[in-house]
Amino acid sequence: MTALRLGSLFDGIGVFPLAAVRCGIEPVWASEIEKAPISITKRHFPDMEHLGDVTKLDGRELPPVHIITFGSPCQNLSQIGNRKGLAGEKSSLFFQAIRIIREMREATNGLFPAIAVWENVMGAFSSNDRMDFKAVLGAFTDTD
């Protein structure tokens, strides 16, 4: 039986890969741009490929994975942030993850990823009178 494989976008310090390993899932690649978190994940996951900036990735070219996890930037969704929501410069990066998921599914005839997991702040539920969360749900259900 093939082990489940994980790709992590907006990886931070590698919490999703850490949880994956504890569940017998193999972290294959990660996308992160901050140097300090990358140094942490390289130490904990020396075999995991680090891909850099999510905006420069093409899901059709990434090694296919069963699970894509991501915690896209929350600054514009947070209740203590500017509340620009998904239209904000940082939080709009959510759509980059959705793009990558769609591209990978296109390249694998819908086989990969089978699961996508998004993590974010509570403000994501209420941002823009809940319309941002409605957009999130719509993006996930429109990834065929």
Please provide the spans of the model-predicted regions:
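Conserved active-site and SAM-binding loop architecture
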Residues: 1-144
